[in-house]
Regions:
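Gram-positive cell-envelope targeting signals
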Residues: 1-39
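Cys-dependent protein tyrosine phosphatase-like superfamily
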Residues: 33-284, 297-399
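Ser/Thr-glycine-rich phosphate-binding loops at phosphate-binding pockets of nucleotides
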Residues: 289, 293-294
Length: 399
């Protein structure tokens, strides 16, 4: 069967299953009745767009390639609620909790003219409880809906986050790691620069995500601190991307020697030393696009935590669904990812995630060691990071 036909057939089946599940959830919540003023409609518990879900649920390279080729700006959560318009309402408060008694609630204020709200930072595979309060312009509560529950998608663990004015934001948690461990949610976020962050974005950044440290992995020549955020410490720890983090002796002749910049190892070391201290967490790490340098440091972090290559690739390639453009592990030919591991190498950009990984394994796991061990060897022997620091990072970020 031709790869494209195979892809469409597989996706059609998955779409039918997802639609049937969504219908079942809808009927379970509402019993097939029209909404009343005390009821909410739950919107899209699958969390993300069809295009992102097609990629995350792809069964093989063919399906991944087809999903990546259809990628556009879909890096947003889409789960939300809607309600019937009410008279004399100045504002609504959406109240959300993971507890049935609504303890430890989060509140979101919505203008009285609105009839929908999309959540920003839900967790996958999590049951939530929600209600809506309406207020007049004197602050008097007019109505409160009953508490309703919903559960987010459970077929994947990746967590994309909406931060208004910032693109390509996601949690690096949720991935399985070696030793029956999982990377914790809510401690390390990656994304693009904060130049255009809005007040709503800042509220998500500080109140919902609770960011304590902003790590900027750009050098001062192409970036720097652009916004003062109360309670958030800023560190600039510049580095380069992909194979340029490896010493010249490891470089393939095709890319030429001299790409390695010794300052990079100082930046990488600084990142790990920051993550080793619990008081610095949660951390937001970024470059300009949140793609290349950020993708490289996240490869090192999740890799040394014990995430397998397939998970590292997914985290990297999800950038393709943001406004930052395509980021694939390699070029593609005849519906296959190419072994040289270079997607782009021209005057516009150098994108070589697969090449970086191959060289890492070649030089730092020469006797067939695991990817986790290869990155550990690199961090210790090239970057001068102590084993104590690495173990502290693991203790902080794994569960």
């Amino acid at each position: 069967m031709h790869p494209y036909v195979k892809y469409r057939y597989s996706m059609r089946i998955k779409k039918w299953i997802a639609s049937a599940l969504a219908l079942f959830i809808s009927m379970s919540v509402f019993g097939g009745c029209n909404l009343g003023k005390d009821e909410l409609q739950i919107l899209n518990t699958e969390m993300y767009s069809k295009e992102v879900r097609d990629y995350l649920l792809a069964a093989d390279d063919y399906e991944q390639i087809m999903a990546l080729q259809s990628a556009d700006i879909y890096d947003k959560q889409t789960t939300g609620i809607s309600w019937e318009k009410q008279e004399n309402v100045d504002k609504y408060t959406v109240v959300l909790s993971v507890n049935a008694d609504m303890s430890d609630e989060l509140q979101y204020v919505v203008d009285g003219a609105e009839t929908e709200y999309t959540f920003n930072a839900l967790m996958p595979n999590t049951k939530y409880y929600v209600k809506l309060q309406s207020y007049d312009n004197s602050g008097k509560m007019l109505r409160e809906t009953k508490v309703q529950s919903f559960k987010t998608q459970s077929d994947f663990s990746q967590r994309i986050v909406n931060v208004d004015g910032v693109s390509n934001v996601r949690d690096i948690g949720g991935y399985n790691a070696q030793g029956n461990s999982t990377v914790k949610y809510g401690l390390l976020y990656r994304g693009a620069r904060l130049n255009a962050i809005t007040d709503d974005g800042l509220a998500t950044f500080t109140q919902e995500l609770g960011i304590k440290t902003e790590l900027d992995v750009r050098y001062g020549t192409d970036g720097g601190k652009v916004v003062d955020i109360d309670g958030v410490a800023y560190q600039q720890l510049g580095m380069w991307a992909y194979s340029s983090i490896l010493p010249d002796t490891c470089q393939p002749k095709a890319t030429g020697a001299g790409l390695f910049d010794a300052r990079t190892i100082d930046g990488i070391k600084g990142v790990f030393e920051t993550l080793a201290e619990p008081e610095n967490l949660p951390v937001y790490i970024h470059c300009t696009a949140g793609a290349d340098r950020t993708g490289t440091i996240c490869y090192l972090i999740n890799g040394v935590l014990g995430v397998e290559y397939e998970g590292l690739v997914q985290d990297f390639e999800l950038t393709s669904f943001s406004e930052q453009g395509r980021r694939w592990r390699s070029s593609v030919k005849n519906w296959e990812f190419q072994s040289e591991g270079v997607m782009q190498n021209d005057e516009k950009n150098f994108i070589a995630f697969g090449q970086m990984h191959s060289l890492m394994m070649q030089w730092y796991a020469p006797n067939g060691e695991t990817l986790q061990k290869a990155i550990e060897n690199y961090l210790i022997n090239v970057c001068g990071i102590s084993m104590e620091t690495i173990e502290s990072v693991r203790e902080n970020l794994l569960v």
